[in-house]
Regions:
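Helix-loop junctions at the membrane-solvent interface of multi-pass transporters
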Residues: 17-18, 118
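Flexible, glycine/charged-enriched surface loops at secondary-structure junctions
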Residues: 24, 61, 66, 160, ...
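Short, small-residue-biased leader/transition segments that mark boundaries at the very start
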Residues: 1-6
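Helix-loop-helix junctions within the multi-pass membrane cores of secondary transporters/permeases
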Residues: 33-116, 170-171
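Transmembrane helical segments that form the transport core of multi-pass membrane transport proteins
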Residues: 18, 23-24
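Alpha-helical transmembrane segments of multi-pass membrane transport proteins
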Residues: 7-11, 19
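Transmembrane alpha-helical segments and their short flanking loops
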Residues: 86-180
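Membrane-interacting alpha-helical segments
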Residues: 29-32, 36, 40, 154, ...
Length: 180
């Protein structure tokens, strides 16, 4: 949760302010409907129409940019999910007494990045990816039950952050790309 807040406020707020030349307050106010929908549905794919509407109508992003960036982001921008899964793998490894070496952490990190790109933007889409990572880390199968039981709580925040990242990317692209 703390990493989500940091990423949402500091990273995306800073990108919008310094790269997108837009007030972070205006940005976060404008995207609130999409962020709340993402939080409630746990689906970045279901939030695509609302995200497009927010960035086009409230932030002045062109349809050309939002029509590419929002769906692409909903498909491959799963960085918050990747962060949550990394923390969960290390938490469960410590809780189960599984020693994860530095080299294994690097392998898990690389696999996590690849798996997060392939994670579907639907509720619970990260469960299969987590199962693969848990197996790689040598965690017992019982951790899946615990992970599935808390996944929705983590998924709500992670999906919200992913969708905010998609919209922040649109604002930055609008500033950086000349559409003449």
């Amino acid at each position: 949760a703390a990493s989500d807040v940091y990423k949402r406020q500091i990273v995306y707020g800073g990108a919008v302010k310094f790269l997108g030349k837009t007030s972070p307050f205006k940005f976060f106010r404008a995207i609130m409907p999409a962020a709340l929908n993402a939080f409630g549905t746990c689906s970045s794919s279901a939030t695509i129409p609302i995200s497009k509407s927010c960035v086009e109508n409230e932030l002045g992003v062109s349809n050309q940019i939002s029509s590419i960036a929002i769906p692409l982001g909903a498909t491959v921008n799963m960085d918050a999910v990747s962060i949550v899964m990394s923390f969960m793998i290390m938490f469960f490894a410590n809780a189960c007494g599984v020693n994860v070496s530095v080299s294994m952490m690097i392998i898990i990190l690389l696999a996590n990045v690849l798996l997060s790109v392939g994670t579907p933007g639907i509720p619970g889409g990260a469960i299969a990816s987590f199962a693969a990572l848990a197996t790689m880390a040598g965690l017992p199968a019982g951790v899946m039950g615990v992970y599935i039981s808390i996944n929705t709580l983590c998924d709500m925040g992670a999906t919200c952050v992913n969708v905010i990242g998609d919209m922040a990317g649109c604002v930055v692209l609008q500033e950086k790309i000349d559409l003449k």
